[in-house]
Amino acid sequence: MASVPCSFKLSAHRRSSSKLDGNNKQCSSLVERLRDKTKSQVPKSITCINRLEISRIAPLHATMNSPKGFGPPPKKTKKSKKPKPGNQSDEDDDDEDEDDDDEEDERERGVIPEIVTNRMISRMGFTVGLPLFIGLLFFPFFYYLKVGLKVDVPTWVPFIVSFVFFGTALAGVSYGIVSSSWDPLREGSLLGWNEAKKNWPVFWQSFWNSSDKR
């Protein structure tokens, strides 16, 4: 008679343990499902945020990296890799990737900021437009002297005057570029003489470097 309640207790204990095991398995399966869902959703949001941040930061990085847009690019130090036998194709792929990265960096350095471009255009409008306008005004002036006032003006005088003013307008293109402030965060002076002294050697150096590469 004493063995019957013992067996009953053991069977009840086994049933309760089997129920606990089943509940634990269900909980673990739910946790794994939640983890899979979060893993599939979180990287997408992170990648979208990263893309937006990169698209916003790229033009600012190009501006602050090379605000002038001129001059030789800084030299880069390339890491030396030890050659390994049987990995020649991998090394070639790595070299091609490095070359592509270098080309992209050079393009970013060559970008002139929009603020600096607007300064150059406004300065060229003054240095080119003013002498060109004055040179064009001399044509009706000489015509009035000759026809209206009957003044005998030599033919070489209009040619010299037009040559001087048109040449000044042509030189104003270069002066408008050089006399502008190439720093996006700093406005230049009115005439831009100090900026021209600083920027002129850099302008010629970049010009000769580009001609040597060709």
Swiss-Prot record:
Gene deletion effect: Strongly reduced growth. Pale-green cotyledons and leaves.
Acidic residues bias locations: 89-106
Membrane-side (Lumenal, thylakoid) residue stretches: 146-152
Transit peptide residue numbers: 1-35
Residues forming coiled coils: none
Listed Basic residues bias regions: 75-84
Keywords, ordered alphabetically: Chloroplast, Membrane, Photosynthesis, Photosystem II, Plastid, Thylakoid, Transit peptide, Transmembrane, Transmembrane helix
Residue ranges of the region described as Disordered: 1-26, 62-111
Cellular component, GO annotation: chloroplast; chloroplast thylakoid membrane; photosystem II
Residue ranges, Stromal side: 36-124, 174-214
Record-level GO BP terms: photosystem II assembly
Membrane topology reported for the UniProt record: Multi-pass membrane protein
Location(s), subcellular: Plastid, Chloroplast thylakoid membrane
Residues passing through the membrane, by range: 125-145, 153-173
Function: Involved in early steps in photosystem II (PSII) biogenesis and in maturation and stability of newly synthesized psbA protein.
Subunit structure: Interacts with the PSII subunits psbA, psbB, psbC, psbD, psbH and psbI, but not with psbE, psbF or psbO. Interacts with the PSII assembly factors HCF136, LPA1, LPA2 and ALB3.
Protein name from the UniProt record: Protein PAM68, chloroplastic
Organism: Arabidopsis thaliana (Mouse-ear cress)
